A protein has these predicted regions:
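Carboxylate-rich helix-loop segments that flank metal/cofactor sites and access channels
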Residues: 121, 741-748, 813-855, 916-927
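Conserved alpha-helical segments that form or flank metal/cofactor-binding pockets of metalloenzymes
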Residues: 791-831, 900-903
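Extended redox/cofactor-interaction regions of prokaryotic respiratory oxidoreductases
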Residues: 96-167, 174-179, 204-208, 297-421, ...
C-alpha cells in the first residue's frame, strides 16, 4: 500500500498493483482506516495519574516512574511480579525488542499478546500436526484450487481482499467448489455450494464425521499417508464412532449435507482449507483445527499448487508476535523443552541459558489475570491492545485492572477504555509514522516505511522499550548493553540471526530487498533467495525431534507430551494425524438461558474500534452493535427488527437492537467491537459483558463463541424503561479516580497493601520436601523391614536408603541458602506416613507386604510432587545449582519408584490370585487386615 502525504499529513492511500498479496486492492478498512492517523483525539504526550486524574507529564517523568515502580516490584515480589500484554498490530522489530526486554532482561515468562484471543489456536494446531508454526499454504493457491473449505471463517468480512480473489474464481471459468462451515448464513456462506451450519461448539463432531466418510468411501490417499504421515490407525479408531446419524444428532447438520460435503472433499483434485475464529474461539479449538489439517493430510493435498492449509490470523501482525516469541512462543519457533534450542537463544542474546525463562510455556493472559487477583503480579504493562473491551467477562477484568495496588501502564495511540483506568499512559506512533516489518498469514513479509512524523511527543513502541531497557541497565553476560539497538533496521538484522536455521529463516531478507515493491515469503535463504511459495512440497515436515517447536499435547486434556512420548510416535519428518473425541461445552443452554451465544466481527469495524471507530466512513457504515436472532426465535419471543432488548448471561447483560435472520435457530450473534469511549448513553453494549473466561486446553485461547444467554424485552414507559442494562465502565473509571490517587512507588512498608510484608512460600515447600526425605529414610530403615519379609526387598532397602540420604546431602546447601521451614513439613509428612502405613506391627502376611509396597509408592509420589513443583521454581530463580540438585533428586526418586513398582508387579499375581487365607481368618477381629477394613 502506498501512502499519500501533503504538508506532513497523510491524505490518502492506494493499493500497490505489484504486490503479490493484494494486487492493488484494498478493503473498506484499508481504504478508510488511515483517517484515524490525523484524528484530533490522538495521544500526544505522556500522562501520569496524579490525585486521581491523568495529567500531562514529560517522557522523563513517565519513564522514571515506570522504572522506579519496576524496581520496587522486583525487590518486593521478584521479576515475576511484572507482566506484559501486547498486540497483534505492532511491527516485528518492536515485538523482538519487547521479547528481549521480558525474556532476556527480566527473565520472566509473564508475556502474552492479544494474539492469544485470535490466533493462538492457529499456531497450536500447526505445531501439533506439522511440528512447528508456519502456514503450509499460500494466498496464490486460491487462484489454482478446485475446492475451498472454509471452516468458521467468514472471509467476506474478515479478509476482504482475499475474498475478492475468491469471488474472481467463483465468477470466472472453472469455478472451484466452496464448502462453508458457519452457524450463520454469512455473506461467505451465501456463496457456498454446500453450507454446513452446525450448532456452536460441535466442530470436532462435524469434522470427525467428514473424516469418517473419507475413510468409509475409500477416499484416503493411502500412498501419501503411508509414506508421509503417522497416527492413521488412532485417528481411524476415533472417527469410526462418528457416523452420519451420530453427527447429525450432535451438530444438527443433515446427513445428506454431510455426504455432499464429504464427496466434494474426497474427490477433488486440489483443496485449500482455511479456518478462523469460528474454530479458534469455539469449544475444542485446537482439536478442531487439527481435524482440518487431518483432512488435507488424508487426501495428500498439501504442498501442491492449489492445495494447502491457511490457519488464518486475526490481526495484521499477529504472525510476527508469534515469530519473535513475544507471546506464547519462543523466538524462531524454538522448543522450550529442547536444551539445544534454549542454548541457541542464549548464545544469540549472550546470556546464560538459565536466564532464558524456559521452565514452562509463557504465561497466558488469563493466568496473568489470576496472578493479579492473587496479588503476585503488581505491575502490568499493556501495549497496543484494549483488554477492557476485548477480554471475556469484562466485569471481572474491570475489577482486577482497577485494583489499587496494581500499577498499570498503557501504551497506545488513543485514550482507550483501558488507558482511562491506567496509572501511566504512553503515547505511541502507529503505522505510517514509523518503520518496520510485518508478516501476512501466508508467510509474506512486507516493509512498512515511515511517511510522516507522529503527533506531538508520541514515540514508536520500539523506542519506548529501548528507553526502558537503557534505564533498567539490562546487560548481557559480558556486562555490555543487552539491547543495544538504535534503529529498526538494526533490530531486523539481529532478528535475521535469530531466525537462522528455523522454519521462518529470513537470513537472505533485507530492508533493501523488501523495499522492492512487493512482499517476500519466508523461508528466504540461500536456497530460496526470493522466498518459498508453499511449505511441504517435498513432504518433509518440521517434526524431527531435534527440530520441532513442540512435542505436542493430548488434545482433549491439554496435557503436554514428553520428549519420550513424542519419540514413541516416531514422526521423523512426517506429519502427525491428531485425533480427538467430541466433548460437550462446559456451559450448555438451559431453561433459564436457552440461546447459544456467538460473537464476531463486522466488515467495517476492527477489534475494539480504537482506529476504525474514529474513521468517519467506517463509523457511519456500522455505528452501533446489534444482536442477530433467527426468524424462529424472534417469532417465539415476539421480537421485531430494531427492537431494543436486554441480553443476559450468567456474567452480565447488554442492551441492543435486534436484527432478524441469517442465523441458525437457537443461536444469537453479537459483534465484539463496541466498548464505551464514544457511547452516547448509559447502555451496556460490549459483547464481552456476556462471555465466559474459559479457554482451550491446548492453545489457551478464550472460547468467546460459547456460553448461554436469554433475551428479555425492553419495554418503554414514561420516565424510562422497565428493563435496562447499565454500563459499568464509567463506574470503574470513577473508582480509579477516587481510589488510586497519584501513581507512585509503594513506600518501604508496602504502600497500598499496608504494613504487612508479603512472604514467599518457597521455604515452606522446601522444608516439607526435606522432612519428607528424612521420614523416607526412617521408612526404609525401620518400617518396611517389619512389613515385608523378602530377602530381595530387604537387600534393596539399603540401596534405597542410601539413594535418599544422598539426595538429602545434595539438598542441604540449597536448604541452608533459602532457609527451608521444617516444622510444617515434618507435621505434614508424619500425617501422610500414618495415613498410608496404618499397619505398623510386624507381619508375615504377603498381602500386608504388597500393601506396604503400595504405601511406599504413594509416599514416593508425595516426594516426587514436591520435586515437580520445585523444578520450574528453581529455574525461575535462575539458580543453576538449585536446578541441578532438583534434577538429580528427580532421577533418584524415579529410580526408587521403578524399584518399588517392579516388586509390586512381582508379588501381586501370586498374592491376589492364589487363595491362602481362610475367610474366617481374613475377617478375624485380631487380624491387621480387619483393622484396615474397619478403618
Amino acid at each position: 500500500m502506498d501512502i499519500g502525504v501533503r504538508d506532513g499529513k497523510v491524505v490518502g492511500v492506494r493499493g500497490r498493483v505489484s504486490d503479490r498479496v493484494n494486487k492493488g486492492r484494498l478493503g473498506p478498512k484499508g481504504l478508510h482506516g488511515w483517517a484515524s492517523i490525523n484524528h484530533a483525539d490522538r495521544l500526544k504526550h505522556p500522562l501520569i495519574r496524579r490525585n486521581g486524574k491523568l495529567e500531562r507529564a514529560s517522557w522523563d517523568e513517565a519513564m522514571s516512574l515506570i522504572v522506579d515502580k519496576a524496581h520496587e516490584v522486583q525487590s518486593r515480589l521478584s521479576n515475576h511480579g511484572i507482566g506484559f500484554y501486547t498486540s497483534g498490530q505492532l511491527f516485528l522489530e518492536e515485538y523482538y525488542v519487547l521479547a528481549m526486554v521480558g525474556k532476556a532482561g527480566l527473565n520472566t515468562l509473564h508475556m502474552d499478546g492479544n494474539t492469544r484471543l485470535c490466533t493462538a489456536t492457529a499456531a497450536a494446531s500447526m505445531r501439533e500436526s506439522f511440528g512447528s508454526d508456519g502456514q503450509p499454504g499460500s494466498y496464490s493457491d486460491i487462484d489454482y484450487t478446485d475446492c475451498l473449505f472454509l471452516v468458521g471463517h467468514n472471509m467476506a468480512h474478515t479478509q476482504t481482499v482475499l475474498w475478492s480473489r475468491v469471488l474472481d474464481r467463483l465468477q470466472g471459468p472453472q469455478p472451484p467448489k466452496l464448502i462453508v462451515v458457519d452457524p450463520r448464513r454469512s455473506d461467505t456462506a451465501k456463496q457456498a455450494d454446500v453450507h454446513l451450519a452446525p450448532k456452536n461448539g460441535t466442530n470436532v463432531a462435524l469434522l470427525n464425521g467428514l473424516q469418517y466418510l473419507l475413510f468409509s468411501n475409500g477416499w484416503i490417499n493411502e500412498d501419501y499417508v503411508s509414506k508421509h504421515v503417522v497416527g492413521l490407525e488412532d485417528l481411524r479408531t476415533v472417527v469410526n464412532r462418528y457416523t452420519p446419524d451420530v453427527v447429525e444428532r450432535i451438530t444438527g447438520v443433515p446427513v445428506t449435507q454431510l455426504h455432499q460435503a464429504a464427496e466434494i472433499l474426497g474427490t477433488t483434485s486440489s483443496l485449500l482449507s482455511t479456518a478462523l475464529q469460528g474454530v479458534y474461539q469455539s469449544n475444542q479449538a485446537t482439536a478442531s483445527a487439527c481435524q482440518i489439517n487431518n483432512i488435507n493430510l488424508l487426501l495428500g493435498l498439501i504442498g501442491k499448487p492449489g492445495s494447502g492449509i491457511l490457519q488464518m490470523n486475526g490481526q495484521p501482525t499477529a504472525q510476527n508476535n508469534r515469530e519473535t516469541g513475544c507471546d506464547g512462543e519462543y523466538p524462531g519457533f524454538r522448543n522450550f523443552q529442547n536444551p539445544t534450542h534454549i542454548q541457541e537463544i542464549a548464545d544469540i542474546w549472550n546470556i546464560e541459558p538459565v536466564k532464558v525463562p524456559h521452565w514452562n510455556l509463557p504465561t497466558h493472559v488469563e493466568n496473568m489475570l489470576k496472578y493479579i487477583s492473587d496479588g503476585s503480579i503488581k505491575m502490568f504493562w499493556i501495549s497496543g491492545t484494549n483488554p477492557l473491551v476485548s477480554l471475556p467477562h469484562l466485569q471481572k477484568v474491570r475489577e482486577l485492572l482497577t485494583k489499587p495496588e496494581l500499577f498499570v501502564v498503557t501504551q497506545d495511540i488513543f485514550l482507550t477504555e483501558t488507558a482511562a483506568i491506567s496509572d501511566v499512559v504512553l503515547p505511541a506512533a502507529q503505522w505510517g509514522e514509523k518503520t518496520g516489518c510485518f508478516t501476512n498469514a501466508d508467510r509474506t513479509m512486507h516493509l512498512s516505511q515511515k511517511a510522516v512524523e507522529p503527533p506531538g511527543q508520541s514515540k514508536a513502541d520500539m523506542d519506548i522499550w529501548l528507553d526502558f531497557a537503557r534505564r533498567m541497565d539490562f546487560q548481557d553476560k559480558d556486562g555490555k548493553p543487552l539491547i543495544p539497538f538504535t534503529s529498526a533496521e538494526e533490530v531486523f538484522n539481529a532478528w535475521r540471526k535469530m531466525s537462522c536455521g528455523r522454519p521462518l529463516d529470513c537470513t537472505e531478507m533485507s530492508y533493501q530487498k523488501l523495499a522492492g515493491g512487493s512482499g517476500i515469503q519466508w523461508p528466504c535463504t540461500s536456497v530460496y533467495p526470493q522466498g518459498k511459495e508453499r511449505l511441504f512440497d517435498d513432504a518433509k515436515f518440521f517434526t524431527d525431534t531435534a527440530y520441532c517447536e513442540s512435542y505436542g499435547h493430548d488434545l482433549e486434556t491439554g496435557a503436554p507430551f514428553t520428549k519420550s512420548q513424542y519419540e514413541a510416535m516416531n514422526p521423523a519428518g512426517r506429519a502427525i494425524l491428531k485425533a480427538a473425541h467430541y466433548q460437550l461445552p462446559l456451559e450448555e443452554t438451559s431453561e433459564q438461558y436457552p440461546l447459544r451465544l456467538t460473537t464476531g466481527r463486522n466488515v467495517y469495524q476492527f477489534h475494539t474500534r480504537t482506529k476504525t471507530g474514529r474513521s468517519k466512513r467506517l463509523q457511519e457504515a456500522y455505528p452501533e452493535p446489534v444482536i442477530q436472532v433467527s426468524i424462529a426465535d424472534a417469532d417465539a419471543l415476539h421480537l421485531v427488527d430494531g427492537e431494543m432488548v436486554v441480553v443476559r448471561s450468567r456474567r452480565g447483560s447488554v442492551e441492543l437492537p435486534v436484527v432478524i435472520g441469517d442465523i441458525t435457530e437457537g443461536h444469537v450473534f453479537i459483534p465484539f467491537h463496541f466498548g464505551y469511549f464514544d457511547a452516547t448513553d448509559d447502555r451496556a453494549r460490549a459483547a464481552n459483558e456476556l462471555t465466559r473466561e474459559q479457554w482451550d486446553p491446548v492453545s489457551k485461547q478464550p472460547m468467546f463463541k460459547s456460553g448461554a444467554v436469554r433475551i428479555e424485552k425492553c419495554v418503554q414507559i414514561e420516565g424510562g424503561k422497565t428493563n435496562h442494562a447499565k454500563e459499568k465502565h464509567t463506574e470503574a473509571v470513577r473508582s480509579v479516580e477516587k481510589g488510586k490517587g497519584m501513581a507512585e512507588p509503594a513506600d518501604e512498608n508496602g504502600g497500598h497493601t499496608g504494613n504487612k510484608e508479603p512472604v514467599r512460600r518457597l521455604e515452606l515447600w522446601m522444608g516439607a520436601l526435606n522432612e519428607g526425605l528424612e521420614i523416607l529414610v526412617e521408612i526404609y530403615r525401620d518400617l518396611v523391614p517389619r512389613l515385608v519379609h523378602d530377602l530381595e526387598v530387604q537387600s534393596g532397602l539399603e540401596v534405597m536408603r542410601r539413594l535418599t540420604t544422598e539426595v538429602l546431602h545434595q539438598f542441604k546447601p540449597v536448604i541452608d541458602r533459602y532457609h527451608g521451614s521444617h516444622q510444617y513439613g515434618r507435621t505434614v509428612a508424619q500425617y501422610l506416613q500414618k495415613a498410608v502405613f496404618p499397619a505398623v506391627e510386624e507381619t508375615n502376611d504377603p498381602y500386608e507386604a504388597l500393601a506396604a509396597l503400595q504405601s511406599l509408592d504413594l509416599f514416593l509420589t508425595y516426594i516426587e510432587g514436591h520435586l515437580t513443583a520445585l523444578s520450574p521454581a528453581s529455574q525461575a530463580l535462575w539458580d543453576s545449582e538449585f536446578v541441578n540438585v532438583i534434577s538429580s533428586a528427580q532421577g533418584s526418586i524415579q529410580r526408587q519408584k521403578a524399584w518399588v513398582n517392579q516388586h509390586i508387579k512381582v508379588k501381586s499375581p501370586q498374592t491376589l490370585l492364589v487363595p491362602t487365607v481362610a475367610a474366617e481368618d481374613l475377617y478375624d477381629s485380631q487380624s491387621s487386615m480387619a483393622g484396615r477394613i474397619r478403618s
